[in-house]
A protein has these predicted regions:
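Conserved small/polar residues in nucleotide/adenosyl-binding loops
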Residues: 1-5
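Conserved catalytic region of serine esterases and O-acyltransferases that act on ester linkages
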Residues: 7-43, 181, 221-231
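Conserved SGNH/GDSL esterase-like catalytic core that processes O-acyl groups on lipids
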Residues: 30-136, 159-169
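A generic structural signal for alpha->beta connector loops
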Residues: 57, 80-82, 147, 184-187
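Active-site flanking residues adjacent to catalytic metal/cofactor-binding acidic residues
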Residues: 63-64, 153, 188
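Alpha/beta-hydrolase-fold catalytic nucleophile elbow
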Residues: 115, 153-154
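Charged, glycine-enriched surface loops/patches
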Residues: 131-153, 170, 174-185
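Catalytic His-Asp segment of secreted/periplasmic serine-dependent ester chemistry enzymes
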Residues: 159-231
Length: 231
């Protein structure tokens, strides 16, 4: 484990035990970027997970937003012997790029399954800008993990973001077209089969995060694609 990771693990443990309520204590919170302020706690928890022996040398990682983070049965559903879930809630493609070096690179996975873009579009990002963010991320992945095979799961339609469906479709198409020219990346189309089946049925009380039926579809699509590259 990198020295920075070890320091972060110790800091996270300390922070969870000691809450600062003293008004005389000077905080560096204002020096932290909005991205770091929003996601730092979740990322530190992931670094603690990485520190555990049971999570070392995982061949496959899930990386991205709460679509992955909330997938509690991912390892069982996917039936992968070695799987590490590095999803963190509310994350954007931008924040994934920010934390990629800290929580994915040290694991050096054989395969990375990636889901992000949902929250970027929800915050008003255009399809073109999202495409550009993906290109920046893909470039960094290629530089830091050139031997990792990567899978981009298309942005899903949802009841909550139905007004953004056209942007989602355009963003998926743009990224898919780019991936066709990238030897390191593969595209997993989650969006089309959800639309074909009537995407509303893949959601229950929560209009943004999928139900069991949605994860059943996602796991099948991932297994089918990964099976093409099993060693």
């Amino acid at each position: 484990m990198y020295k920075r990771q070890e320091e972060a693990v110790e800091l996270a443990k300390s922070a969870s035990k000691n809450k600062i309520n003293n008004e005389n204590v000077v905080s560096n919170l204002n020096l932290v970027s909005p991205i770091e302020e929003e996601f730092e706690a979740d990322v530190r928890e992931l670094e603690i997970k990485l520190h555990s022996d049971q999570y070392k040398n995982n061949q496959i990682v899930l990386f991205g937003s709460s679509t992955f983070r909330d997938w509690e049965n991912a390892k069982t559903d996917l039936s992968f012997d070695s799987l590490l879930n590095l999803g963190f809630g509310g994350s954007t493609l931008v924040s994934c790029r920010t934390y990629f070096n800290r929580i994915v690179v040290p694991n050096n996975p054989d395969k990375m399954i990636f889901y992000a873009g949902d929250n970027d579009i929800g915050s008003g990002m255009s399809a073109e800008d999202l495409e550009n963010e993906f290109l920046l991320f893909a470039s960094e992945v290629n530089e830091k993990l050139p031997h990792t095979l990567c899978f981009f799961v298309s942005i899903k339609p949802s009841v909550f973001r139905n007004n953004y469906l056209n942007t989602i479709l355009e963003a998926n198409e743009r990224i898919k077209n780019k991936i066709e020219n990238f030897s390191q990346w593969r595209y997993i189309d989650l969006c089309s089969p959800m639309l074909d089946a009537g995407f509303e049925k893949f959601y229950s009380e929560d209009p943004l995060h999928m139900n069991v039926l949605g994860y059943s579809l996602l796991s099948k699509l991932i297994r089918d694609e990964i099976s093409k590259f099993t060693i």
